Amino acid sequence: MTVILRPGSVPLSDLETIYWTGAPARLDAAFDAGIAKAAARIAEIVAGNAPVYGINTGFGKLASIKIDSSDVATLQRNLILSHCCGVGQPLTEDIVRLIMALKLISLGRGASGVRLELVRLIEAMLDKGVIPLIPEKGSVGASGDLAPLAHMAAVMMGHGEAFFAGERMKGDAALKAAGLSPVTLAAKEGLALINGTQVSTALALAGLFRAHRAGQAALITGALSTDAAMGSSAPFHPDIHTLRGHKGQIDTAAALRQLLTGSPIRQSHIEGDERVQDPYCIRCQPQVDGACLDLLRSVAATLTIEANAVTDNPLVLSDNSVVSGGNFHAEPVAFAADQIALAVCEIGAISQRRIALLVDPALSYGLPAFLAKKPGLNSGLMIAEVTSAALMSENKQLSHPASVDSTPTSANQEDHVSMACHGARRLLQMTENLFSIIGIEALAAVQGIEFRAPLTTSPELQKAAAAVRGVSSSIEEDRYMADDLKAAGDLVASGRLAAAVSAGILPKLEN
């Protein structure tokens, strides 16, 4: 199903659909007239003699050099090819598709001055599955994501490399195989394609979507751990959280209550339990995971604005003037990425502490050491917990802010930059680590629940436990564990663990 984009009002849900499903996207036809009007204005400037940055001048520090009208097409070609300086591994197809959709949205606002031909080619590439090879490194997040977006633009011109039908090939070959033709860029079109924050924004959105999916799964594993440790649900009482007032905390507590409702394990110790309070990793889940949820929701609002923004330069304004500005500076995206990193780090940190609690007989209220059937002969989940600690610590290091690390570039013309691109890209590794941490907690918590037999957990959590056991059987004795950890992490990453419980329980990303 094709996602129809209405630039300026594209909802987060449409972007998430493109990311998770690979759905093609195209602009609503109602925006064609605005695009064509701006393109006509650029053509007028080319026909005249007045120098206008990015149209008939050089770029960056070379902006004072006037370009003859006969060289305008060559200028655009040279711009793209000279800026194809990315290094590192190719970005994955889901990221590149999102980048292309975001570029459509920006161009569709009618302020970039590109021809409809250019827009139609991007739409066709998405529809046919021509995915430009974009190296992951090379952007400092201002003046836009120049190098990575140049690799996208190069394929549109028949240069560079692309993936098509599962094969890596030259850009012109990929277009030909898909029945498409390369475009010759007109005035300003090269700059419009590469001068934007779409790579940083796509990476940040991917980090956001993955972090939220992990956060939803963490509520399930947190509830399972609460029951496995025979923890109290009293700290999730709604009045406690209403008195504080944070929406994420209130929603998180409500989800935990619903997940634990009807648990025979909980009912068995609701009276006469000599423990007065649980450790913070059980008791303070609403406060910690709720704060993370609030942070992700705030970031979601920022990135929705950025996804709908025009981040090109110069811009064709509503009065038909062409004005240079700085919308290419990705500082909002850099801040958003740093905030997502904090949330990812903390969701994993409190999950890891619950894993540590479950494997420690001094804390787990009757569970065997390391959740092993015969501790000593078997090591159980001893080293799985160590792995979770390693991943947690790695995420702590990766969570350090990228946005504060500016450096001047381009002969000091671009003297302050955002570092949004790598700040957002590290979220992919951080969320991959988080999926594994939560997967390990799922294994530990379900194993702990089984040790409480004949008592069982709640109906909702039984469904989640069944999903875990669908990919990893009960650990009766020590075995090769890497496959179990991968399967559990994949269960979280795919969204299948979150989908195992009834719809409407887990908090949504948008308020």
From Swiss-Prot:
Cited InterPro entries: Aromatic_Lyase (IPR001106), Fumarase/histidase_N (IPR024083), HutH (IPR005921), L-Aspartase-like (IPR008948), Phe/His_NH3-lyase_AS (IPR022313)
EC number in record: 4.3.1.3
Listed pathway(s): Amino-acid degradation; L-histidine degradation into L-glutamate; N-formimidoyl-L-glutamate from L-histidine: step 1/3
Mod. after translation: Contains an active site 4-methylidene-imidazol-5-one (MIO), which is formed autocatalytically by cyclization and dehydration of residues Ala-Ser-Gly.
UniProt-listed SUPFAM superfamilies: L-aspartase-like
GO molecular function: histidine ammonia-lyase activity
UniProt entry tagged with the keyword Hydrolase: no
Listed Gene3D superfamilies: Fumarase/aspartase (Central domain) (1.20.200.10), Fumarase/aspartase (N-terminal domain) (1.10.275.10)
Subcellular localization: Cytoplasm
Known catalytic reactions: L-histidine = trans-urocanate + NH4(+)
Name of the molecule in the record: Histidine ammonia-lyase
Gene it is expressed from: hutH
